[in-house]
Each structure stands twice: as C-alpha cells, then as structure tokens.
Amino acid sequence: MKIRTSVKVICDKCKLIKRFGIIRVICVNPKHKQRQG
C-alpha cells in the first residue's frame, strides 16, 4: 500500500474506490495498491 497525495490508475485492472472519504486504488497487482493521505 502506497500512501500518496495524488492517486492515479496505473493499469487497466486498477479501480478507483471512494470509501468513507478516502480514495483508494485496488488492483490485481499488489504493487498498484494506493491510498490518498
């Protein structure tokens, strides 16, 4: 999980999800996991 100020979709399988005001990226590739902080 990478915590970044700007969350970007890296590949086709990345999905942007907003949960409780936190923007996340969920992907098949665990390296692509991100969270805005």
UniProtKB/Swiss-Prot annotation:
Keywords: Ribonucleoprotein, Ribosomal protein
Assigned GO CC terms: cytoplasm; ribonucleoprotein complex; ribosome
UniProt keyword annotation of Cell inner membrane present: no
Domain of life: Bacteria
Biological-process GO terms, alphabetical: translation
Gene Ontology molecular function: structural constituent of ribosome
Keyword Ribosomal protein: yes
Cited PANTHER family: 50S RIBOSOMAL PROTEIN L36, CHLOROPLASTIC, LARGE RIBOSOMAL SUBUNIT PROTEIN BL36C
Sequence similarity: Belongs to the bacterial ribosomal protein bL36 family.
NCBIfam families for the chain: rpmJ_bact
Protein name: Large ribosomal subunit protein bL36
Source organism: Treponema pallidum (strain Nichols)
Gene name of the encoded protein: rpmJ
